[in-house]
């Protein structure tokens, strides 16, 4: 089998396509959450904390020299990233919880007992006849 045919067989499997769609949607969701945190959540928190802009919070390790930019630890951006992660992780948790709940409901649904086989029906009839003879 040629490499191209193998790749087509691999890529056309449902799981690979589902995974690709999930990755694309996840990346888009990550951008939405990042914007939500940076543009909607953090400004009011900054105002509450006395006009702090979290994007600018940093510790300067070495000042800018000539063309070289300053070396900084940007802990404000790190705080925003932690909030991004927390929101995304919570959304994933809630989604998985809903999926697992649906799976449990499907698993818990009582299955109809299997119909007795012909052998079992014959044995039941023989048993009933023997009981009837013993009662006489």
Curated annotation (Swiss-Prot):
The chain crosses the membrane at residues 9-29, 79-99. Its main location: membrane. It is found in: Cell inner membrane. It comes from the Bacteria. GO terms for cellular component: plasma membrane. Keywords: Cell inner membrane, Cell membrane, Ion channel, Ion transport, Membrane, Transmembrane, Transmembrane helix, Transport. It is a multi-pass membrane protein. The keyword Zinc does not apply. InterPro entries: Mechanosensitive_channel_CS, MS_channel, MSC/AndL, MscL_channel. GO terms for molecular function: mechanosensitive monoatomic ion channel activity. SUPFAM superfamilies: Gated mechanosensitive channel. The keyword Aminoacyl-tRNA synthetase does not apply. Belongs to the MscL family. Channel that opens in response to stretch forces in the membrane lipid bilayer. May participate in the regulation of osmotic pressure changes within the cell. Homopentamer. This is Large-conductance mechanosensitive channel. It comes from Shewanella sp. (strain ANA-3). The lineage of its organism: Bacteria, Pseudomonadati, Pseudomonadota, Gammaproteobacteria, Alteromonadales.
């Amino acid at each position: 089998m040629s490499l191209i045919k193998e790749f087509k067989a691999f890529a056309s499997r449902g799981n690979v396509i589902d995974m690709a769609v999930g990755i694309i949607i996840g990346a888009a969701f990550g951008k939405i959450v990042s914007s939500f945190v940076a543009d909607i959540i953090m400004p009011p928190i900054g105002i509450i904390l006395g006009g702090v802009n979290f994007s600018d919070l940093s510790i300067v390790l070495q000042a800018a020299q000539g063309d070289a930019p300053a070396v900084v630890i940007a802990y404000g951006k790190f705080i925003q990233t932690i909030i991004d992660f927390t929101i995304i992780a919570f959304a994933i948790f809630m989604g998985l919880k809903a999926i697992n709940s649906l799976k449990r409901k499907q698993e818990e649904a009582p299955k109809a007992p299997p119909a007795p086989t012909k052998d079992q029906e014959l044995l039941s009839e023989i048993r009933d006849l023997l009981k009837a003879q013993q009662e006489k």
